[in-house]
Amino acid sequence: MGPRARDLGVVIGRLGPGPHNAITDVGGVRVGHATVVRDEPSVARTGVTAIWPHQGDPWRERVYAATSILNGYGELIGIDQISEWGLLHSPVVITSSLAIGLAYDTTAR
């Protein structure tokens, strides 16, 4: 892996990184992750990451959000609402394209 932008002198934003250089340096942000690696009864290599924007109820206490399409590939549910309202009302869930429906259904429950 090559050098990070910061190592090359690139400054992004006005604030520096937090003490752990992690998304969880932001107060209230929570991150959960699960990885599945198995060979029986069938081969599975997958995972899911969920990011909660704060400790409250994201459906009632929405946060500002924006989107950016980097390469035009991938599945994204909720982009229209973020683009129209500029608000996020759920956790951000990152998973494979084939698991996005299950992630959406689980998050909506």
Predicted regions: what is each one?
Residues 1-109:
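Alpha/propeptide regions of enzymes that mature by internal proteolysis
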